[in-house]
From Swiss-Prot:
Pfam families: Phage_B
Site description Cleavage, residues in chain: 76-78, 93-94, 108-109
InterPro entries referenced in this protein's UniProt entry, alphabetically: Phage_B (IPR003513), Phage_B_sf (IPR038149)
GO molecular function, one term: peptidase activity
Region (Disordered): 1-65
Primary location group: host cell
GO CC list: host cell cytoplasm
Biased composition (Polar residues): 1-37
Gene: B
Protein's organism: Escherichia phage G4 (Bacteriophage G4)
Protein name: Internal scaffolding protein B
Amino acid sequence: MEQFTQNQNQPHTQESVQNTNVSQFRNETVINGSPVSGNPDGTDPSGLRRDPVQQHLEAERQERAQIEAGKEICRRRFGGATCDDESAKIHAQFDPNNRSVQPTEFYRFNDHEINKYGYF
């Protein structure tokens, strides 16, 4: 009881309170005997654990975002028409600036090369 009253009478400055929490906010802590940053056992640089389920959910989220982007491209390209998920994936991967071979369904068949030779 005496100790409690003595601690209560001591003034606590904000600096002394902040110094007790410094190690909690820095990335200098050690998890499982190795530093957090660059830890090969599933921790990312922010120090959060990333389990396989979370990685799977993130992959699904990225795939869904890619499909939505492809559907938006379909709507713009085909005047508001919708397309299925597989076509949306292909549309999202199509790059009009890429000169390598891409799926033929994306070429405009009224191009002068096709009209002139019948093939490309």
